[in-house]
A protein has these predicted regions:
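C-terminal alpha-helical interaction appendages
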Residues: 1-65
C-alpha cells in the first residue's frame, strides 16, 4: 500500500472516530466490517475535505447495513 494512501486512511479513521465518539479499535472494526478501507482507495475522496469524507463514509456504511 502506498504511503500516502496509508496516511489518508489513518486521517479518516481518526476523524471518523472523533466525530462519532468511537475508539480507534471500534472504528477500525467498523471500517473492516463494511469494507470502508477499500472504499477509501477511491482517489476522488482525497480531494475533498475530511468533513465531506466522513459524510461519504456514513453514506457508504448506511448503504451496506
Amino acid at each position: 500500500m502506498e504511503r500516502d494512501t496509508v496516511k489518508f486512511k489513518v486521517y479518516c479513521v481518526e476523524e471518523y472516530r472523533r466525530v462519532h465518539g468511537l475508539t480507534a479499535p471500534q472504528t477500525v472494526d467498523l471500517f473492516e466490517r463494511y469494507g470502508v478501507f477499500g472504499f477509501l482507495d477511491e482517489p476522488a475522496l482525497r480531494w475533498q475535505s475530511l468533513d465531506n469524507t466522513v459524510i461519504d463514509i456514513d453514506e457508504y456504511i448506511e448503504a451496506r447495513v
